[in-house]
């Protein structure tokens, strides 16, 4: 990681033309400030911090290699049960990337009840694209400055969350997961956080108030999640291809619990499937206990509870396996 002035200088000398022109010019100017004795120590510190952040990001081209649709489908089937329409839309996006070798003009907006796997879809897409991903939770953003950073004229100035996301990803091409987009217009500070998102989504570049350099965003693929589309402004909605995700049916929940949720928990805690057996009546009871809840989050917690109980009985009561019927589940 480049932190010292000398390491940053050496890197810039080696990087040459590999840096975008505007970033190279910006870096030389800030390096001059960081070395200068004619500015305040605070200005030098800010310049060095900004340089360290920018030079530790790999500034990649917006050319994307072809992606195997068959492998993409395998990943989707591995990560998600059902959701055929969602998978079809993602595969269509992959094929479009293969034709143009660039990201689509629009990101994805996934709208559905809580717990229906919206975040899981976003992670699967990042895995398919072989890109780092970062998350932005709009429910915790009260002021646009949290996103854009603060000017270096202030002693406690710092970069914004968006710039931090690029820094943590370590490259300019990434999947930007924006959770709870329907909360974006509810800022309590000065201005509207949604307006900042528009500049990020337009693919025309983004400028952080602390960094003071326009960074390319053509390699950013935004995927947003929301529960209520009526709370999303028309300008924001127009930047996305919208996919509505319905809640799971009871039969789908049965399959998800028995084939995905419970085996996943058992594997994680080192148990074999034959050590924790769920009868058909027990499975019906699990689904019945959670019939009034949307999504599968509560089912995943039920799987945790059943697996933990089975492990307890095996270790404490020294039984070889535990069978859960309807009475035990309830």
Where do the language-model regions lie?
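Short loop/turn elements that form and flank the Walker-type P-loop nucleotide-binding site
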Residues: 103-106, 129, 148, 169-174, ...
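Conserved catalytic/switch belt of AAA+ P-loop NTPases
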Residues: 178-216
